[in-house]
Amino acid sequence: MDKPTVQDIFHRFYPAYLDQYSPSPVQANVAHNIMNCKTGAYGANVCVCEDCGFVQIHYNSCRKRCCPMCQAVPKEMWMDARREDVLDAPYFHLVFTVPDILNPVIYSNQRLLYDALYHAASSTISELTADPKHLGAKVGYICILHTWGSEMNFHPHIHTILLGGGLASNNQWKDNGENFFLPIRVISKMFRGKYLEELKRLWEEDKLVFHGTAEKFRNHYTFKELLDSCYGMDWIPHCKKTFNGAQTVIKYLGKYTHRIAVSNHRIVRMDDDTVIFLVKDYRNEGQWKELTISGVEFVRRFLMHVPPRRFVRIRHYGLLCSRTKSQKLTLCRNLLGCKKYLSKLRDMEMPEILEHLYGIKVCVCKACGGHLGKPQMRMPLRC
């Protein structure tokens, strides 16, 4: 028997999930997309072999970012486009996290408080790197929001890929060699202060809502106690090892940019009531282990991580801002004496991309090896 997929799990358990929970319109739309992806619901392309007459039908995908069947090619195309943005210089990986006690409030106010995470992380990096005590230069970096832990629990955090140098005010390159140039304790205090200041401002302006387990924070004194507790905690960002070289950076980025809460390869099996999937045990050096939860709980956890509609998860800052990126990166390359890496996929059609990436020849007949003509009929959406 084939291993189950996220789509199989939703087909089996989503109706029972609806008996217990009320998904938001965005969550319901994602569930619909997952269950109907590549089933014919979104139409199909029909090709006929020019040699043997074999008819080949390809069902269309939903192309949604939360669908585990639709991320591979967009990820590769995004990574390929970013080849032109990276430099042969050190890079660092920072992870900004918040205390778990804030999770109920963040989940109730996702768009506002996710944005606040980006603002706090980006302003912390920009201010510290501009300070001559630490670097005194304008750097480039990418911030990516993840909202899940390995067990699909709610765990919002920002991954930041930071260039280990930048342009000083005199337009000269400045770096600190292979060493990380920002003190972690200073990052922690500044990030904590900026995020809690934004949270307090939104609360004072009555822009926050409180649902579910966050209901208790409607009370003025309870919310103030929450803020006081957070100010008293150490918010320790993680700085992971450095890595060099444009190609290494691209591969590293791909691990984070187009991830979803759980991928199909982590699903082990399911039965009439439960789902078993692989999770990382960080108490045991990150070893993989199996976790069993109910099918309804699996669906609930998965849908927790559906971002708000049209929410931008991958954001570029500093030297990578689109307004000045081309000019600034060209200057950096000239100063560093490194070459520009060109996109390989930009001018390719989708059949060429699939063959280049996966060796899939979509224009070759599976029956005789002959040539498949262009789609002669596009089946409409299934009613």
Locate the predicted segments by residue.
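Beta->alpha loop/short-helix hinge microenvironment recognizer with preference
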Residues: M1-C383
